[in-house]
């Protein structure tokens, strides 16, 4: 039996903790990555592990929550997560790659308690928000190489952050941040060019 098959059986038997342990083991065997304990690697299902691509020397801090759902209920866009070499996901970070892809370039740091969301629900009157389809016109997040996202920041669906950019702590990023610039605030705005 494969590791994914074993995880599915454990989930079916209600042994969720054991299934998470098996998935964590599979990720560690396939990728030289350091996960601090406790880290929630999965939340929606145990068949989407191939939607995660990890480079070498990726570090995921304690209490991080990494959610990848390839086929989300209210979206036709695939959820995927790609963390390139040397990426640091700090303590308490929440990555939600469902209904869109999240890509983080080599050497980037997502500081403590940041939230990165690949998709969000549409605003449609008269429908419970949780049941509205996801906005497929603005989804996915691209974070370039050597980017530093300050603690407590939120990166919204559709955001594109260029290489060597810095996001000040507590910012809300939407839209495009050019390479080599410092942005901050709610919503994040240009502060200066990094020289």
Feature map (PLM): residue ranges:
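Residue-level signal for alpha-helical context at structural boundaries
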Residues: 126, 183-184
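Conserved coupling/switch loop of ABC ATPases
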Residues: 97, 157, 175
């Amino acid at each position: 039996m494969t590791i994914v098959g074993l995880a599915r059986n454990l989930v079916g038997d209600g042994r969720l903790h054991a299934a998470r342990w098996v998935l964590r083991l599979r990720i560690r065997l396939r990728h030289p990555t350091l996960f601090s304990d406790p880290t929630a690697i999965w939340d929606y299902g145990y068949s989407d592990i191939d939607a995660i691509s990890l480079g070498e020397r990726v570090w995921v801090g304690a209490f991080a929550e990494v959610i990848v759902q390839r086929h989300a209920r209210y979206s036709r866009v695939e959820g995927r997560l790609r963390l390139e070499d040397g990426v640091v996901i700090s303590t308490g970070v929440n990555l939600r790659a469902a209904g869109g892809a999240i890509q983080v370039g080599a050497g980037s740091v997502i500081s403590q308690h940041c939230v990165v969301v690949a998709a969000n629900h549409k605003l449609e009157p008269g429908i419970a928000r949780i049941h509205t389809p996801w906005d497929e016109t603005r989804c996915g997040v691209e974070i370039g190489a050597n980017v530093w996202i300050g603690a407590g920041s939120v990166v919204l669906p559709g955001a594109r952050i260029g290489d060597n950019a810095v996001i000040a702590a507590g910012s809300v990023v939407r839209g495009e941040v050019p390479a080599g610039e410092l942005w901050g605030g709610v919503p994040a705005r240009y502060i200066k060019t990094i020289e």
